[in-house]
């Protein structure tokens, strides 16, 4: 049996954190794209890519990292989407990168992703930055939909026995906007490295 096409575009695995971070730094990731919405945000993202950021995590990110495998196991059991630690590149642009939390192939052959979040606040709607992350991952991998899964906690204790989730469908219009913003960021980075 032939490997699934997206598996031919694996760039790195986050289990080798140094190689994964090095590979991520060479391109534009879903984390980068989540912050892109204005010309000023492109400049800020370029600065962070060129000079790094001082943020290395906090108790909330530590909690999210600790809970992610537990939530990923729930996603696998209930939706058949396998946990993933792979960094993928897009088919059309090698600097467009994404590391979804889960990747699965549906019975009809469609590629489905999972993105896992933890939150200390209830959501009235899905934060826009998370939608940008999801659409970017769909674009990079060629996925049709993503199961966005979030677990609310109070004092780092989950408030419900199971996480909440919602399917996010692919949106070509939003993806086109994100690709344009990412390419503007790449142009900015390339210009800075030529100086």
Description of each model-found segment:
Residues 68-72, 131-134:
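Short, well-ordered alpha-helical scaffold segments within catalytic/effector domains
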Residues 72-74, 82:
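Gly/Pro/Ser/Thr-rich low-complexity, intrinsically disordered segments predominantly at protein N-termini
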Residues 60-61, 73, 186-195:
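Contiguous, amphipathic alpha-helical segments that mediate oligomerization or scaffolding
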Residues 53-54, 148, 193:
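Secondary-structure transition/capping residues
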Residues 1-70, 78:
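Charged, glycine-rich intrinsically disordered N-terminal tails and low-complexity linkers that flank
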Residues 1-2, 110, 192-195:
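Short intrinsically disordered terminal tails
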Residues 79-190:
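Nucleic-acid nuclease catalytic cores
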């Amino acid at each position: 049996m032939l490997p699934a096409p997206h598996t031919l575009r694996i760039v790195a695995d986050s289990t080798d954190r140094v190689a994964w971070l090095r590979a991520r730094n060479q391109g534009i990731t879903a984390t980068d794209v989540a912050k892109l919405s204005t010309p000023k945000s492109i400049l800020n993202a370029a600065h962070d890519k060129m000079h790094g950021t001082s943020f290395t995590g906090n108790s909330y990110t530590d909690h999210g990292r600790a809970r992610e495998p537990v939530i990923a196991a729930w996603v696998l059991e209930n939706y058949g989407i396998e946990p993933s630690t792979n960094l993928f590149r897009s088919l059309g642009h090698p600097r467009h990168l994404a590391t979804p939390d889960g990747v699965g192939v549906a019975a009809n052959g469609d590629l489905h992703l999972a993105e896992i979040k933890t939150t200390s606040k209830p959501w009235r709607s899905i934060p826009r930055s998370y939608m940008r992350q999801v659409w970017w991952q769909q674009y990079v991998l060629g996925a049709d939909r993503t199961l966005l899964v979030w677990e609310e906690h109070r004092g780092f204790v989950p408030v419900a026995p199971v996480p909440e989730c919602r399917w996010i469908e692919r949106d070509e219009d939003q993806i086109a906007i994100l690709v344009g913003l990412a390419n503007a960021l790449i142009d900015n980075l390339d210009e800075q490295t030529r100086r």
